Amino acid sequence: MSTAIWILLLIVALGVGVFGGIFIARKQIEKEIGEHPRLTPEAIREMMSQMGQKPSEAKIQQTYRNIIKQSKAAVSKGKK
């Protein structure tokens, strides 16, 4: 094979590897965030108290469930 074909194959393989790696990394990050959200009830409690609110446990849990529901909806919307 000529040198030009080898260079072309190398560029194509590099492009496929980069795009494949980006796709796989994106899916892994979405899965990780979906399973283990970064925002916890303790963090919500801290944010509400910093804003001057005195949240009840029910309000914290409601906010947490809404955040989880929205993140799952965003992930499922992205899969369509």
UniProtKB/Swiss-Prot annotation:
How does this protein sit in the membrane? Answer: Single-pass membrane protein
What is the scientific name of the source organism? Streptococcus pyogenes serotype M5 (strain Manfredo)
Cellular component per GO, a single term = plasma membrane
Localization recorded for this chain is:
Cell membrane
Record field: transmembrane? 4-24
Please state what the protein is called.
UPF0154 protein SpyM51556
Cysteines joined through disulfide linkages: none
Location, primary (coarse class): membrane
Keywords, A to Z, come to: Cell membrane, Membrane, Transmembrane, Transmembrane helix
Family indicated by similarity: Belongs to the UPF0154 family.
| Top-level taxonomic group | Bacteria
